[in-house]
Amino acid sequence: MRWKELMQQQDDFAVEIRKQDAIKFASNPFIKAFCNRLDPNIIHLYFDDGNSGGSVWMHLICGECGALLLDTGYGIGNLKSVIGQLTDKPVSVFNTHWHGDHTGGNSQFENVYMHEFDIPYWKESLSCEAGRMLPTTLAFSQDAVIPLSDKFVRAVHDGMTFHLGGRIETIVHMPGHSAGNCMVIDSKTGILFSGDAILSTPTLVIDGFPAVDHAELLTVEAFHTALVQHMKQLNKVKWLCPSHGRLMLSNKYVSAMQHCTEEILKAPDKWERYDYIPSLPSMIRCVDDAMIVYTLNRIH
């Protein structure tokens, strides 16, 4: 099965990255940083939870007059201190989506942005223990866990831009994984920061995530529609840096993901059994290097 080959590549990556030279921080031993090979002003921060599927990336993009931090991870350890050691520019945070492994450290920052459709989900998750999504495969003390906060989060929409000085970051709304799921295009490098939408691990469009607001956007069909809508723009990107798995993926992943959504919509019952993570639904579709794990009630 092709998806098993791809997940073996992911497991190999998870082992290899632990051996690579990285910037480490006394103030937060949970995070390692790597400079992008094309642009040292893009810094990738890696939180290794000991589980190759759950380890998460945050991305710091630095311009001449400002910086943008994409996601804040699980909220374990002092992330603000890490960012302060990497840039002296004023920092804004943009959450690619509301899930707890991407928003856990938000309370450490003042200027936080999120797509308007995900803000209600994020607010609801603050009062739900399961919404915190703390890793279960990593040893850490409760003292290291950053308290959540309902401080004001600014709403964004498709096409909004962040001007950092010498580079512009453009928001691309890409629903499916969440109602307000987004990606970000960097004008200087052509890198697409693809969040949990397009990555080297499976994209999840499953009923394990709530569908209270804008339920029609938590579907494979909505994902496909957004890919088609933005394909002219996405075809111009050069590389993909997702929130999980390998970085600097070829832009072929974009068209492969569109084809994967097409195949699911044509024949939703044509799937393979996915047993990599027992707690997840077992239906997976794989087209080239693109993978989607889905449930039948999230097709349309």
Regions found by a protein language model. Give the residues of each.
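Metallo-beta-lactamase
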Residues: 18-40, 67-69, 75, 111-175, 178, 188, ...
